[in-house]
A protein has these predicted regions:
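Glycine-/small-residue-enriched transmembrane alpha-helix faces in small-molecule transporters
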Residues: 1-46, 85, 93, 153-180, ...
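Membrane-interface helix-cap regions at the ends of transmembrane helices
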Residues: 7, 30-33, 37, 41, ...
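Helix-helix packing/entry segments at the starts of transmembrane helices
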Residues: 25, 50, 106-112, 178-199, ...
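Specific transmembrane alpha-helical segments of multi-pass solute transporters/efflux pumps
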Residues: 27, 31-32, 60-106, 110, ...
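Loop-to-transmembrane alpha-helix entry segments
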Residues: 73-78, 110, 126-146, 154-161, ...
Length: 306
């Protein structure tokens, strides 16, 4: 392969990784749709068991047709165990917070995870924080503040906030571990094992909190199926490629589209008002995403043309 072909391949992977980062954020931003199952009396662990259980079945079928081996070595086992437990903790604490505060508010507070990701990478892995990265973090964080700040001074649940912050921290570490583990396997295989931990963990939590609850009607099953395919399978698969091709911090910052998606769901599906404050917040978040994407592409071009 010539140098030009190699450089073109690297550039295409960078673009693909950026698109996957955006896609993962939008897909994951549809998580609030699952909160409507709470109106039927379902608890977070039961909702998540069906979500991850169905996702696991779909992934298993895909892998069967791909004839992909499930064999892993000891290092991969430890890495996949860590990823599974981290995603289990992040998803469960987020869905628990949905019972204590508005899902849109919880989804926007979750966005502190890019700040945590950048901080962890700088503190423990000596990753340099450039001006554009810092600017993106500031713009996106201010945008999120505008999305969930209430002018009437409404007080949020302290327990709910703590749960969301735990979700953000474990999600940030998940992204970093995914990037640092350098797992030489397909995204389907990675998520096959991640989903095992998530499904079994939530099943155990469900039985510890009164027993597993089953969706009672077609609408509920449709909602669970959506949660299994979109924010579980699609988001997880795209997250693998994003972290692999563009790194932890850009992937996390592109997650700014998660709260934006949550707000748009509230506006178009639940009739929530669209105010100038929301418009400014969304604009700042999109600006942050554009800056980090341009910064990533500029860095790639510099490395290709010394």
């Amino acid at each position: 392969m010539s140098d030009n072909q190699h450089n073109t391949l690297r550039t295409n992977k960078k673009i693909f990784g950026t698109l996957c980062g955006i896609g993962a954020a939008v897909c994951y931003g549809t998580n609030p749709l699952g909160a409507q199952l709470y109106s039927e009396g379902m608890q977070p662990a039961s909702v998540l068991f069906w979500r991850f259980g169905l996702a696991f079945i779909i992934i298993a079928i895909v892998m069967m047709f791909r004839k992909e081996s499930l064999r892993i070595n000891r290092r991969e086992f430890y890495a996949l165990t860590g990823l599974g437990l981290l995603f289990l903790a992040s998803s469960l604490t987020l869905y628990m917070s949905f019972k204590l505060m508005a899902v849109g508010v919880a989804s926007t507070i979750l966005f502190v995870y890019p700040v945590l990701t950048a901080g962890i990478m700088a503190l423990f892995f000596k990753e340099r924080l450039t001006f554009s990265t810092i600017l993106s973090i500031v713009l996106s964080f201010v945008g999120v503040l505008l999305l969930y700040w209430s002018p009437d001074g409404t007080r949020l649940s302290a327990t709910g906030i703590v749960l969301v912050l735990i979700s953000a921290l474990t999600y940030a570490v998940y992204i970093i571990v995914m990037n640092r583990a350098k797992l030489n396997m397909s995204s389907f295989k990675i998520n096959f094992y991640v989903l095992i931990y998530c499904a079994l963990g939530n099943l155990a939590m469900a039985f510890c909190s009164g027993g597993l609850q089953v969706p009672q009607n077609a609408t509920s099953w449709l909602c669970v199926s959506w949660l299994a395919v979109v924010p579980a399978i699609l988001a997880l698969v795209m997250m693998v490629y994003a972290a692999k091709y563009i790194g932890s911090t850009p992937t996390a910052i592109m997650g700014a589209l998660e709260p934006t998606t949550a707000v748009l769901i509230g506006i178009f599906l639940f009739g929530e008002p669209f105010t100038s404050r929301l418009a400014v917040g969304i604009a700042l978040i999109f600006a942050a995403v554009i800056i980090i994407a341009l910064k990533s592409n500029k860095k790639e071009k510099a490395s290709l043309n010394p």
